[in-house]
Amino acid sequence: MDRFVWTSGLLEINETLVIQQRGVRVYDGEEKIKFDAGTLLLSTHRLIWRDQKNNECCMAIPLSQIVFIEEQAAGIGKSAKIVVHLHPAPPNKEPGPFQSSKNSYIKLSFKEHGQIEFYRRLSEEMTQRRWETVPVSQSLQTKKGPQPGRIRAVGIVGIERKLEEKRKETDKNISEAFEDLSKLMIQAKEMVELSKSIANKIKEKQGDVTEDETIRFKSYLLSMGIANPVTRETYGSGTQYHMQLAKQLAGILQAPLEERGGIMSLTEVYCLVNRARGMELLSPEDLVNACKMLEGLKLPVRLRVFDSGVMVIELQTHKEEEMVASALETVSERGSLTSEEFAKLVGMSVLLAKERLLLAEKMGHLCRDDSVEGLRFYPNLFMTQN
């Protein structure tokens, strides 16, 4: 902690903000200190921590002081962390929260997630070392005399340790990749066999394709629909997470919406998405928050809330006039229909069928008969006949 210096938190000339994350706690080695909940900012030149309650409490450490970084997975009751190993503090360091520290590393605990994306961006900055190619004002430089080079400060033991960490990380990534590939090959083999069976039955016209086989076939396709689901661990718990989730939802919902006439209830969407995400289940609250951003991001699907409070997802090209005209035509052909009867005819849920009929009634094309036998809709003859 003695490497940190007090700062205003303002970016210097030629310094660029890379990423920021709320809810980050700073540890001095393994020790908890008073810097509990703050916003961690990564720029091209510094790591900046600002207290969320007291914005005047702001400290920073130059990226040039970092030797290497490593991830620490979350545990039971423990948040995921990034461990930052540091060079020794220069003798002429500017004032900071600590004058001395026995630890050569700090830990950054991410209480609101987002550590995966932050670690990736920090690793990129450490590799690119843009603070060397794009100098900033002298106020950022914590040294006035010559600073030891990176290799000299680390030492042979430090270099060997860093190489060993990289080797372990590479081995882990390779093992996970082969494990995922094996699972994919097993699932792909089953899917190919099933698809051949269905194709042969259709081609030879011998027997009908059973509903169970169709469901199995679609489930394999759906389970492989989201290769890399958006998670809080990757994007944190704020607006960025819901924006990325909204973009992914638009991608996976467009085809199912087209199959279902351009509209689905939010309940159907919730089941469909969580089935595709596998173990990375989505909460109803996150789904609603992401869907609220669909239209603002100009995506091909949008959230719609009916007067009754029912929420649906529909295609941007889905036209209300065509939907009402279709409902009027169907009811006119049958003379009158209940929501259940209309749902069976058009092949949609009773909930959506009722909302479509109510919308047609609201626009004056249908009228209702609400009796002990239930709610029944009729064509509004006052609108269709002179």
Curated annotation (Swiss-Prot):
| Source species, domain of life | Eukaryota
Major site of localization recorded for this protein: cytoplasm
Q: Where in the cell is it found?
A: Cytoplasm; Endosome; Late endosome; Membrane
Q: Which Gene3D superfamilies match?
A: 6.10.140.260, Pleckstrin-homology domain (PH domain)/Phosphotyrosine-binding domain (PTB), Winged helix-like DNA-binding domain superfamily/Winged helix DNA-binding domain
- Which residue numbers delimit the GLUE N-terminal domain? 1-88
A Gene Ontology biological process noted in the UniProt record is: protein transport to vacuole involved in ubiquitin-dependent protein catabolic process via the multivesicular body sorting pathway
Pfam family membership, one: Vps36_ESCRT-II
Domain GLUE C-terminal, residue spans: 105-138
- Give the molecular function GO annotations: phosphatidylinositol-3-phosphate binding; ubiquitin binding
Please give the GO cellular component terms listed in this UniProt entry.
cytosol; endosome; ESCRT II complex; late endosome; late endosome membrane; lysosome; nucleus
Q: Which residues form a coiled coil?
A: 160-185
Q: Which UniProt keywords apply?
A: Coiled coil, Cytoplasm, Endosome, Lipid-binding, Membrane, Nucleus, Protein transport, Transcription, Transcription regulation, Transport
> What role does it play?
Component of the ESCRT-II complex (endosomal sorting complex required for transport II), which is required for multivesicular body (MVB) formation and sorting of endosomal cargo proteins into MVBs. The MVB pathway mediates delivery of transmembrane proteins into the lumen of the lysosome for degradation. The ESCRT-II complex is probably involved in the recruitment of the ESCRT-III complex. Its ability to bind ubiquitin probably plays a role in endosomal sorting of ubiquitinated cargo proteins by ESCRT complexes.
How it assembles, according to the record, is: Component of a complex at least composed of ELL, SNF8/EAP30, VPS25/EAP20 and VPS36/EAP45. Component of the endosomal sorting complex required for transport II (ESCRT-II), composed of SNF8, VPS36 and two copies of VPS25. Interacts with VPS25, SNF8, TSG101 and CHMP6. Interacts (via GLUE domain) with ubiquitin. Interacts with RILPL1 (via the C-terminal domain); which recruits ESCRT-II to the endosome membranes. Interacts with ECPAS.
Q: What is known of its domains?
A: The GLUE domain (GRAM-like ubiquitin-binding in EAP45) mediates binding to ubiquitin and phosphoinosides.
The text of the family note is:
Belongs to the VPS36 family.
UniProt name for this protein: Vacuolar protein-sorting-associated protein 36
Instruction: Please name the taxonomic classification of the source.
Output: Eukaryota, Metazoa, Chordata, Craniata, Vertebrata
Q: Which gene produces this protein? A: Vps36
